[in-house]
Amino acid sequence: MRPASGVHNVQATMQVNWRGVFPAIVTQFRQDQSLDPDATAKHLETLIQAGIHGVVLLGTVGENTALEYGEKLALLKEMVPVVHGRVPVLTGVAEYTTALGCRFARDAEKIGIDGLMVLPAMVYKSDQRETIAHFRSVARATGLPVMVYNNPVSYSVDVTPEMFVELADEPALVAIKESSENVRRITDLVNLLGDRYILFCGVDDLVLESILLGAHGWISGLVNAFPEESRALWDLAASGCWEQARALYRWYTPLLHLDTRIKLVQYIKLAMAETGLGSEMVRAPRLPLVGAERQEVLGVIRHAIATRPAVGQTIVFRGLPTVERP
C-alpha cells in the first residue's frame, strides 16, 4: 500500500479484489408492490452471465429506504445463494441511526454478504465529526470490508478527501464510491492518499473520465438495462482502447444522464422494461412515469436501442472500424 507524501495515519487494510463493473441492482416488485425475489434473482443471474465483476444490493437504485428492515434481510438471504461466490456481493447500509446501521451490518454479515456499502445516516444531515464517527462505528461493527458511499447530491452529506485522510486508520474501510459529480475528486484522493482506497465511480455519465483518472471500478445503475454495453465500455477503457471507448460512451451518454436525475430509479426500470430485462414497477412514494415525462424518457431509451452498437466478441460501430474485445 502506497500512501501519499505527508499522510501518516494510513493503516494496513483488508485485502479485497473489488474491480470493474458492479451494478447497483434494482429490486423487483410485483404489481401489488410486494417484493418479487424470483424476478430479482432472475435479473441478477442475467447480469452475472453478462460478465459483471460484482454486485451491490440495496443501494439507491435498489430502493433501500423503501424496504422494511426484515424485507432487506429476506432479499439478501435469497440473493446470496444465487451468486454462489461467483462475484463479490455488497449490500447497501442506509439506516436512520448509527446503531441501526451497525445492527444491519451484523445481520448482513451473518447472511454471508461479502462487503458493505455504507451511507451516512439517513434524514439527519450530519456534520464532519458526526459523519466520521458514523463510518467508524459501522466499520467496527463487523469483520467485513466496507465501501464508503459519498453522494452529497442525493444525501446532502459530503465526505471530503480530507475526511478520508482522517478515516484512513480504519482497516475495514477499503473503498470509496465517489458520487459527488466532481470528477476532480478522483485525482484529489489519489494525491492525498495514494492507493489507500479502491476508488469507484458512482456517477454513470462520468465513468470514462473517472477511468482515465484512475478509478478502479464503476457502480452503475444503467448496467441493469444495458449490461453487455457496460461491460464492453469498461473493457475498452481499461485496456486503453480510447477511440472505441469514446465512440461507445458517446452513444451511451444520453442514457447515462438518466442516472443523475431525481427519478433515476423510475428511469432505469423503464429502460429495463424496454430492453426486456425487468419490470418498471416501483414502490410508493415512487410511481411509474406518465405523460410527457414518460414520453421524453422513452424517446431517449428507444433512440439508444435503435442505434445501439453490436457488442460481442467484436464491437461494431457505425462509421468506425470493427474492434476486437480486449
For each predicted feature, which ranges?
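Active-site beta->alpha loop and helix N-cap motifs at the rims of alpha/beta catalytic domains
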Residues: 11-23, 28-156
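Alpha-helical structural signal in soluble globular domains
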Residues: 50, 74, 78-83, 107, ...
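Catalytic alpha/beta core domains of metabolic enzymes, predominantly
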Residues: 140, 152-262
